[in-house]
Curated annotation (Swiss-Prot):
Top-rank taxon: Eukaryota
Gene for this chain: YTM1
Region span, Disordered: 225-261
PROSITE patterns: WD_REPEATS_1, WD_REPEATS_2, WD_REPEATS_REGION
PANTHER family recorded: RIBOSOME BIOGENESIS PROTEIN WDR12 (PTHR19855:SF11), WD40 REPEAT PROTEIN 12, 37 (PTHR19855)
GO CC annotation, single: nucleoplasm
Compartments where found: Nucleus, Nucleolus; Nucleus, Nucleoplasm
Assembly description: Component of the NOP7 complex, composed of ERB1, NOP7 and YTM1. The complex is held together by ERB1, which interacts with NOP7 via its N-terminal domain and with YTM1 via a high-affinity interaction between the seven-bladed beta-propeller domains of the 2 proteins. The NOP7 complex associates with the 66S pre-ribosome. Interacts (via UBL domain) with MDN1 (via VWFA/MIDAS domain).
Taxonomic path: Eukaryota, Fungi, Dikarya, Basidiomycota, Agaricomycotina
Main subcellular localisation: nucleus
Protein name per the record: Ribosome biogenesis protein YTM1
Keyword Repeat: yes
Length: 448
């Protein structure tokens, strides 16, 4: 080591399964992330190296220690507290699934299939070999979102929401080959007088929440009643002509299927004063929503009451994702930010520590079950960004799903892969730890 090299006192901490003994280390200030990661691995004597990133005062270290200290005014006599976290592998494209229509929502939660909904009103299922195993016309207008209610072997009960002013409960069977797959609309949910923007099933699959541009949130059970709970709407001459066209056009979805039971809501939640853009479950009895009225609201679903309102000045919200364990919510808005909120208070987790800037409007956000801190956003500039909420200055990684200016409209992050939906169809990328994605990666790469 060069005698002129200075050292910095460092204390390490971590929330990973790889803690170091509590002691002070004298680290050469010329060291970067790679050197620190080597130090941790050697000190722990790990049989298989584990790559780490390092957080210094809420910022991921991307320079030498000396450069970081100079930029932040930290002297050599001070002791740096550095937290290390497991590194996220560089994003790697696994597969692409072309669509003729824009993809509005995507799910990576099924072990053997990817699900998408699109602006043509269809729900589609793809196996890991990129085969279409189901193509179901469910709605007569673009589907805005969907949620898996329950499953048994290859049969799934799903809920969908649409711009056709309705939501639905459907049952699908995913078979091999496609001819053995099937779908059936079980019930249509009738409440809203404007497009239904989102739908969410609770973890037990017993209740649903719907949000709409009419400012209302509907609470529904998922049982299918023996008879209709809502009268059939009056059909005008124009509606009759449209219905006749649908009978001869199998590609047109029809939420008014004669076999579907018309359901009424259990409760209607009222508090928003503008479009509600997204709703989600926070607990078995609590919901959370965001809207164009620049508010984030929590709900006591059983009592039908708004329990907390978080207001943000001129910040119309487009999407949200919740972390149930931490009782936090991440929102994306038209002011080109993602913001982290503690739902136990009425404020963001401080303006400095809670906002994540984007160069273009972020349209969607998703958390991952594998981490309490990692999150992915998709934006109208076509860029997907992976973040660690402990570091607000820059994304961990970013990549373009498609060439050109195609917008990202939906993201999902499960089992170490990110599903990306939008104007370019569906793309699936490997983003995560090696052991999370190994099996899926091999299967997807064989089919690429």
């Amino acid at each position: 080591m060069d005698a002129s090299t200075s050292n910095q006192a460092v204390v390490f901490s971590t929330q990973t399964p790889y803690p170091l003994p509590s002691q002070k280390y004298m680290i050469p200030t010329t060291w970067r992330r790679y050197h620190l990661s080597q130090l941790v691995n050697k000190a722990l004597g790990l049989a298989k190296p584990v790559p780490f990133d390092f957080l210094v005062k809420g910022e991921i270290l991307r320079t030498t220690i000396a450069e970081w200290c100079a930029e932040n005014g930290v002297g050599e006599e001070e002791t740096l507290e550095i937290e290390y976290i497991e590194s996220v592998l560089p994003p790697q494209r696994l597969s692409e699934f072309p669509h003729e229509s824009w993809v509005s929502a995507v799910s990576c939660s099924l072990p053997t299939h990817f699900l998408t909904t699109a602006y043509d009103g269809h729900l589609r299922a793809f196996d890991l070999s990129k085969n279409v195993t189901l193509d179901a016309a469910l709605h007569s207008a673009p589907i805005t979102s969907f949620s898996v209610i329950s499953s048994t072997v290859d049969t799934y009960k799903l809920a969908t929401s649409s711009l056709d002013l309705t939501a639905q409960i459907s049952e699908i069977t995913l078979g091999e080959p496609q001819s053995s797959s099937s779908n059936k609309v079980l019930a249509s949910l009738h409440l809203h007088t404007a497009p239904v923007s989102s739908i969410a099933a609770n973890p037990s699959g017993t209740q649903l929440l719907t949000s709409s541009w009419d400012s209302l949130i509907g609470v529904w059970d998922t049982t299918i009643p023996p008879k209709h709970e809502v009268p059939e709407p009056t059909i005008t001459a124009a509606d009759q002509r449209t219905k006749k066209r649908r009978k001869v056009d199998p590609s047109s979805g029809d939420s008014s299927s004669p076999t579907a039971i018309r359901k009424a809501p259990l409760t209607v939640l009222k508090s928003h004063i503008g479009r509600v853009s997204k709703v989600a479950w926070l607990s078995p009895t609590q919901g959370v929503s965001c809207g164009f009225d620049s508010t984030l609201r929590t709900w006591d679903v059983e009592r039908g009451l708004c329990t907390r309102t978080i207001s943000a000045s001129e910040k119309p919200f487009l999407d949200l994702a919740v972390n149930v364990e931490n009782q936090t919510a991440l929102t994306v808005s038209t002011d080109r930010t993602m913001t982290l909120y503690d739902l136990r208070t009425e404020e963001a987790l401080s303006a400095a520590a809670g906002s994540f800037l984007h160069p273009a409007t972020p349209s969607c956000v998703a958390t991952t079950p594998e981490s309490s801190y990692q999150v992915v956003t998709g934006a109208y500039d076509g860029v997907v960004r992976v973040w660690d909420t402990r570091s607000t200055k820059a994304a961990i990684s970013s990549f373009k799903a498609w060439d050109g200016t195609k917008k990202v409209l939906a993201v999902d992050w499960k089992r170490g892969v990110i599903g990306i939906g939008g104007e370019g169809g569906l793309d699936v990328w490997k983003v995560g730890l090696e052991n999370e994605t190994q099996g899926l990666s091999k299967e997807s790469q064989r089919s690429a």
